[in-house]
Amino acid sequence: MNKERKHIVFLARWYPHRYDPMFGLFVQRHAEAAALFNDITVVYSQQTTDNGQQTLSTDNQQTVRTYCIRPFEIVRTLENNVDTIRIYYKKPKNKILSLLRFYRANMIGLRLGRKDGRGEPRPYDLIHVHILTRLGVIAWIQKLLHKTPYIITEHWSRYLPGNDFGGFIRKLATKIVVRNAKLVTTVTDNLAKAMQNHGLKNDNYVVLPNVVNLDMFHISKKNTDATSHVPTIIHVSCFEDKSKNISGLLESLKIVEQKGIDFQCTLIGEGMDFDLMKTKAEELQLINKVSFTGLLEGQKLADELASGDFLVLSSNYENMPVVILEALASGLPVVSTNVGGIKEMIDETKGILVEPRNKEALAEAIIKMIETHNDYDPDYLRKSVIEKYGYESVGKFLDSIYNK
């Protein structure tokens, strides 16, 4: 006899939208994994600076309804079996009005999600909050008013040392929200401990794996003849230099080049510091050694990863970058700074870790990987991801959490 599917609503602070199809992609993947075993509705609100009405174009998307409740534009779609409600609204200049509009937008989304696309009642069994604190307050209020339990998944690295988690009201609200949650999940044990160090207490902290599309990311056979093959380094990030430290990576690559070692580095992504990093590469005279692809998604990203020899990340702080899992699924070893929860995934059989903010150490690790990347077993690297991070595995894990 089949188990009855629960109706779970994701209240997401980060989620792909019309202006940024990569924003919070890992939350969308969790929703898709959860939808294998339960009925999932996603509610997401996004401030805008324009009046245009356009829809996010994705594969496997069916528009159910698009309409306006001033000043909100609501776009409801069915995406990979996930009922997705995006609420867009123009950004007010007043901060208090902006906060009130944010809460109203999410309350509208919650109300709409209680009915399916045909208008049939569909109450929530559980609220799944992704990223604190504001959405956690909404979930807490819903628990008080409707007795609907909620759980939390935190992805944000703001609790880690050196990051900004402050303010009396914010901390107090976060403590209340976390204490009253049925369960708290994080994508690394490191983040869970950091949250608890801030006094965010809950009896049930659980590590929730990220999701990798194992059908998309694949191992590619390469011509690695030592006499002709130029090692290809891959870097993927959102090009925000404060955290991702792309400038430090470029400086390390310059050290490698000055030692007379041949390589090519492909930098994938876009973001606020994209143009600045291109200028930095020009200043370092690395234009013949590095290339900037801009944003790559889906199969294009998977194919570019598979064409490389290894992945390099140079972050100053991180949580658990999904791109590491995608690289391993593609059979690529990893060179990374030892920050956040990365050491929970990368050991000496999968790559090399170095201390952050040390360009000489990163350069030495890159040189070592250029010399030894063929010693890593691509099948072993991929297998390390398959059993834990596939859609079905994570979907079953979420289902077990929802039924606790």
Q: What is each PLM-predicted segment?
A:
Residues 15-18, 150-167, 180-183:
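A short, histidine- and acid-enriched strand-loop-helix "catalytic/donor-clamping" loop
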Residues 190, 211:
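Carbohydrate-associated surface elements
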Residues 333-336:
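Short hydrophobic beta-strand element within catalytic cores of glycosyltransferases
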